[in-house]
């Protein structure tokens, strides 16, 4: 377990390990989890960074909101670590039939460009790594 620095800034709480410089401005993005329990958000963000799942995470500084787990888009092993963590901790919602929702990885460039809702299209999705029916890695 690595030491984690916690920083509150602009409505967000960041969790950092001092390795953020490896994140490339145009390749960096995040897998997201929407929460309604701030204590849980604190726990999963801190744990993910401390255990090397990702080098940076953040959550909204509110009782509900979003957690973001950061990595570079071309870091295939990093995607697998984060998604494995999501699956192990039941962070991906399921449909009524038990199938995992096909969540998306969002580049920070897309966020900076204001791509939200129907304007947002991801090239990296859960289905590229995991069978949505079984939750097993491909």
Where do the language-model regions lie?
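Structured alpha/beta or helical-core interaction and ligand-binding surfaces enriched in interleaved
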Residues: 1-138
């Amino acid at each position: 377990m690595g030491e984690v620095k916690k920083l509150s800034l602009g409505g967000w709480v960041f969790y950092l390990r001092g390795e953020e410089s490896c994140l490339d401005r145009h390749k960096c993005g995040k897998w997201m989890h929407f929460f309604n329990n701030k204590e849980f958000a604190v726990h999963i963000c801190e744990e993910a960074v401390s255990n090397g799942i990702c080098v940076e995470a953040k959550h909204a500084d509110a009782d509900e909101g979003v957690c973001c787990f950061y990595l570079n888009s071309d870091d295939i092993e990093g995607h697998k670590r984060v998604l494995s963590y999501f699956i192990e901790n039941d962070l991906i919602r399921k449909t009524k039939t038990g199938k995992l929702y096909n969540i998306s990885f969002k580049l920070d460039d897309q966020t900076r460009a204001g791509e939200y809702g129907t304007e947002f299209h991801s090239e990296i999705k859960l289905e590229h790594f995991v069978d949505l029916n079984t939750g097993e890695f491909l």
